[in-house]
Regions:
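Non-catalytic C-terminal accessory domains or segments of carbohydrate-active enzymes
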Residues: 32-41, 87, 105, 627-631, ...
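Acidic-aromatic substrate-binding/catalytic surfaces of carbohydrate-active enzymes
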Residues: 32, 50-134
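N-terminal secretory signal peptides that target proteins for export/translocation
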Residues: 1-9
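Active-site-proximal substrate-binding groove within the catalytic cores of carbohydrate-active enzymes
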Residues: 57-58, 93, 248-249, 467-696, ...
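Conserved structural scaffold segments of CAZyme catalytic domains across common CAZy folds
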Residues: 113, 118-142, 146-157, 161-397, ...
């Protein structure tokens, strides 16, 4: 965070205005999902007068003041937030409790944040204003900030906590607000069944900016039905830390409270999330070697699990069953020959999964005598990069046991072990330094089959805190590194402040519904997204999920139906779902060999190129992706479903009928694209792929090639086992951001 500090002394009355120069050119890249109303936030300001500080913009005014050595929150009328003397609370393990008002207020300063056009985080591409306060109590020191960037419809506060001596903590409450519900008439409630779920009302959203937060209104579930009868509703965020803050170490935590545009809770939160996530949404199509080179071949005994202290790199034993550098190079060479040289495209990264390492060391086994040197060079020739799988707590199966065995007597392969933590960060950072890594797949931070939070032990809590800390530490090396944090994550939207992608839950592969095994696989994958995100955590974005994308392999327990058309449907769903990360678990020989309806081979490479074109072409609208239709499989019936995105200018729509019989869906384009109620417009759609049949024998009832009023009822008919993809334009030429011009 680049900033300039100005200490306030005596009587100062001034307006500090953020500069508009450069905002609009940046905004196209920094903010692809915009607060969905006509009036926008505009430039952030800071007004200071004597002991008063007012952060504001076109949408909100947030006031603070200093009285008798206490920094006081004076409220925010637009968000119905009441004044309070308490900015945060802390509790130590010995049951000592104190708040900001109990600490010594050392200083209050104003801050100006400059825009960084190259920042990975969208919000940092905008200028802003802030207030910084320093509090002390004994050996403890807290730096607290209130931050308002240009274009923000929300306020963030940040805490950095340090201590001169070790102090054992219990919890911290960085968010302590009270809502005047007499005025708001809409009480914030927890939306979602996970740790790190959002507090949401018709007017505001709030929460700690960590998936480990417990956000609450302190109302028992039995009383939720009558919550709006209460005059005042608390909003608190609790950060549980049953561990020791070591002397000289710093803990950081933050929170947000923001406005909800009328009838637009999802997009209002998403507009905030896209600005504040660790790295802005961007296409990340990757090849992953798991099925082609690794599955069932990654468990070589590695010295039979016995470790010789003289064998510091754990190279003894037979790793010949694991994948080799030669195999990896062969894969990359074939992608260059069949894909890059023909279509001018490549995955953003070639990712090499479990099996490359000498167990426990996160260095290379003898099958990689030069590490990833050659595959990195080959990938760079296509403008691509590489990445790899690492299991922070060891991984799975026998290889996982061997890795954990290596750390026996060394403090354990736990992220709470300082020696192992530092070693893991170093190994990850070395991969960036040596091989220009673009991607890490951090897998298995817990063993839960379907997670809604961390393992509920102190060790489980701290393992999750540690992976968050690791990702923040390694990102210092490369701001745009892409993290796919897999098993052990859950559907909290605040994971995206750390990780770029999270896991959809349950098995890598499975079957649900009807149709052949490939159709059932697609249904299984998408049903879990509907269950765990759309249904149970509806505010959590679905625009960067690990779903297992496209699986086309001879190896492992996966679909063995090799129908060309079915594979194309799987590809179009994998891209049409709008996830920035599309995983290609594809054997190149199958991409070569599978024949189309005319008996020709090689067509799947072309279909993949078309899909990547579609993603790139629609990258400006896909961050808005959201669910359309029903549950892919509700236990009894397969239902039409899909994904849509809209940004006021463009739109995309992907629909799938997973049933073995034709089906219909009756809707409006307003509902499909989640268009705000005050906007009156029409949308013109076109088919995204030339082979899609529109009309008889294909999809019907969805007008294509002509303007359709968004409030007109339409009944869409789809043939069995079908996928159709569309893109189009909004004929109203409306821009949410035009108020910022």
């Amino acid at each position: 965070m680049k900033k300039k500090n100005k200490k306030h002394k005596g009587i100062i009355c001034s307006w500090a205005l953020g500069c508009l120069v450069g905002i609009m050119p940046l905004s196209a890249n920094a903010q692809r999902v915009v607060f969905p109303q006509a009036k926008q936030a505009g430039t952030a300001t800071l007004k200071t007068c004597e002991n008063k500080f007012v952060l504001g913009n076109n949408l909100l005014q947030v006031s603070y003041s200093v009285n008798d050595g206490v920094l006081r929150f004076d409220g925010c009328p637009e968000m119905d937030l009441l004044p309070s003397d308490v900015l945060f609370r802390m509790r130590l393990a010995d049951c000592t409790e104190f708040s900001s008002s109990d600490m010594n207020l050392e200083s209050v300063t104003s801050e100006t944040y400059t825009a960084d056009a190259q920042a990975a985080k969208g919000a940092e591409r905008f200028e802003g204003k802030g207030i910084k306060a320093v509090f002390t109590r004994g050996n403890m020191r807290v730096e607290w900030r209130a931050v308002l960037r240009d274009g923000s419809h929300y306020l963030r506060t940040e805490m950095s906590i340090t201590s001169g001596k070790d102090v054992t903590m219990d919890h911290i409450k960085p968010m302590v607000y009270a809502v005047d519900n007499r005025k708001a008439k809409s009480a914030p409630v927890v939306v979602g069944n996970t740790r790190g779920a959002v507090l949401l009302s018709n007017k505001i959203f709030a929460g700690l900016e960590t998936p480990m937060g417990v956000n609450t209104n302190n109302v028992d579930s039995a009383d939720i039905a009558t919550i709006n009868n209460r005059d005042i509703i608390p909003m608190e965020g609790n950060w549980v830390r049953h561990t020791t803050l070591k002397a000289g170490k710093t803990w950081k935590v933050s929170n947000v409270v923001g406005l909800v545009a009328e009838g637009q809770p999802r997009r209002s939160f998403l507009a905030y999330s896209e600005r504040e996530r660790a790295a802005a949404w961007h296409p990340m199509t990757i090849y992953n070697s798991w099925y082609e080179l690794n599955i069932d071949r990654n468990n070589a005994p590695g010295n039979l699990g016995k470790y010789d202290p003289d064998d510091r790199r754990n190279l003894k034993g037979n790793y010949s069953g694991n994948m080799t550098a030669t195999q990896c190079e062969d894969v990359v060479a074939n992608w260059k020959e069949k894909f890059y040289d023909v279509y001018g495209k490549a995955p953003v990264a070639f990712v090499f999964d479990d099996g490359w390492d000498a167990y426990g060391t996160w260095t290379f086994n003898p099958n990689f005598p030069e590490g990833f040197k050659n595959v990195d060079r080959m990938a760079r020739e296509m403008g691509a990069g590489i990445g790899a799988w690492l299991g922070p707590v060891g991984g799975y199966g026998a290889s996982g046991e061997y890795r954990r065995g290596y750390w026996q007597g060394r403090g354990g392969m736990q992220l709470s072990n300082p020696a192992y933590y530092d070693y893991f960060v170093k190994c990850s950072s070395d991969m960036i330094d040596k091989y220009d890594f673009r991607f890490f797949k951090y897998d298995g931070i817990s063993a839960q089959f379907s997670a809604v939070g961390p393992d509920m032990t102190d060790a489980g809590l701290e393992n999750c805190e540690a992976i968050i800390s690791i990702e923040n530490d390694v990102r210092k090396k490369r701001k745009d590194i892409f993290y796919n944090t897999t098993v052990g994550t859950w559907a909290s939207p605040f994971w995206f402040h750390v990780s770029d992608a999270v896991w959809r839950q349950e098995g890598d592969f499975g079957k649900a519904g009807v149709g052949d095994d490939r159709e059932q696989w697609i249904t299984y994958r998408d049903r879990l997204v509907h269950q765990n995100f759309v249904d149970r955590s509806p505010i959590c974005p679905i625009n960067t999920l690990m779903t297992h994308g496209v699986i086309l392999s001879r190896f492992g327990d996966v679909s063995k139906t090799m129908s060309y058309d079915g594979i194309v449907r799987e590809m179009r769903c994998a891209f049409g779902c709008g996830s920035s990360m599309v995983e290609l678990y594809t054997d190149y020989k199958l991409l070569d060999e599978i024949k189309d309806s005319k008996g020709k081979t090689g067509g799947l490479w072309k279909q993949l190129a078309y899909c990547m074109d579609w993603q790139q072409r629609n990258a400006d609208v896909l961050p808005d992706i959201h669910w359309v239709g029903g549950n892919p499989w509700d236990g009894e019936k397969a239902n039409i479903y899909g994904w849509a995105a809209w940004n006021g200018k463009k739109a995309t729509l992907t629909l799938r009928n997973p049933d073995v019989a034709p089906q219909t869906l009756t809707t409006t384009l307003r509902d499909v694209f989640d268009i705000p109620a005050y906007i009156k417009t029409s949308v013109t759609l076109r088919g995204s792929y030339a082979d899609q049949r529109i009309g008889k024998g294909g999809i019907s009832g969805l007008p294509v090639g002509k303007a359709v009023d968004i409030d007109k009822k339409i009944t869409i008919s789809m043939p069995k086992s079908s996928v159709f993809v569309f893109e189009g334009v909004d004929n109203g030429h409306f821009e949410f951001g035009e108020a910022n011009k």
